Amino acid sequence: MINFKRADHIHICVPPERLEEARQFYTEVVGLKPTHRPEVFRHPGFWFEIGDIGFHIGIEPGLVNTSRHSAFEVKNLEEARETLESKGVKTYEEEKLADRERFFFLDPFGNRMELLEYEHD
C-alpha cells in the first residue's frame, strides 16, 4: 500500500518559444506567486505557489490539446470567473456535478484548467 500524504505539485508544459508569455499569464492574469526554482534543471521553466501546492511550468514542443486538466478549489468561484473574464480569458462550463460548482478555461498554450467550489450545507 502507498500511504499518500498530499499532492506536492502540478506540472504543465508550454511551447519553448512561449515560456516567458506563460510566466506573464500566470502572474499577471491568474495572479500566482512565483517561487524559487532550483538551478539544477537542464530545461528552463518557472515555479509558482497555489496554496501549499507547487505549480510548475516547463517546456515541450509539439503539444496537443486533450481533456487532461488540473483542478483547483477556490474560495469564491464567481469572483475567480470575473477576474479571469475581465482579463480576456474565456471560461466555459461542462456537466454539472451535484456537490460543486465549477468552470474551465484554457491558458494561452492549450492547458485546460478547472476551478471549483464545493457547495456547503
Model-predicted regions and their roles:
Residues 1-23, 68-70, 121:
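N-terminal beta-strand motif that seeds the catalytic metal site of vicinal oxygen chelate
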Residues 12-54:
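Core segments of cupin and vicinal oxygen chelate
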Residues 40-44, 64-66, 97-101:
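Short acidic/glycine-enriched loop/turn segments that link adjacent beta-strands
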